[in-house]
Design a protein with these regions (language model features):
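Topology signature of small-to-medium multi-pass alpha-helical membrane proteins
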Residues: 1-167
Length: 167
């Protein structure tokens, strides 16, 4: 967890000069994060099932067309995506209860989920030699980290102080 906090501090340093979201919006996001994550977990489970189906059909089709090497790369890339997304969905599901009570643990789990999702997307894109996929993964991670860092002050022991300073 110590390494996670070091990484959090480093990313926060990169984002410190960016403009902030409106206070009312960040407060709304923080207070409603738990049910937004429930929706994300449900959609994530559907995405996992879709990826599993695509793996089965895609590998069979590519293999039948005489492209076993391409089929193998597709299969490896899909497995990496499936594992990364699966871990991310499980970590997000673990974050729901702490997010509901505005605990820092919930925020930390969302941060970890974003890291896992980013790492899985990058590895999957590199295996399939999809450089644009790496760019999109970096863009999605940057937006996710920005939003997470904007709502961070509402979670944990410092949350009460942040709420008082907003009033």
């Amino acid at each position: 967890m110590e390494q996670l906090h070091k990484l959090e501090t480093m990313i926060a340093g990169w984002m410190k000069d960016l403009p902030h979201l409106p206070r009312n919006f960040t407060k709304w996001l923080a207070e409603n994060a738990w049910w937004l994550v429930i929706i994300g977990v449900a959609l994530g489970v559907l995405a996992l099932m879709t990826t599993l189906s695509a793996m089965t059909v895609g590998s069979a089709v590519l293999g039948a067309l005489g492209a076993p090497v391409l089929g193998g790369a597709f299969l490896i890339s899909s497995v990496v995506s499936l594992v990364g997304a699966g871990i991310s969905v499980v970590v997000e599901a673990m974050a729901i209860s702490p997010l509901k009570t505005m605990q820092k643990k919930g925020w930390d789990l969302l941060f970890l989920s974003t890291l896992v999702s980013f790492a899985g997307a990058v590895v999957s894109s590199l295996v399939s030699v999809n450089i644009i996929g790496v760019v999109w993964a970096a863009l999605a991670a940057a937006i996710s980290f920005y939003i997470l860092l904007e709502v961070k002050s509402y979670f944990g022991a410092k949350a009460k102080l942040a709420e008082k300073s907003a009033e």
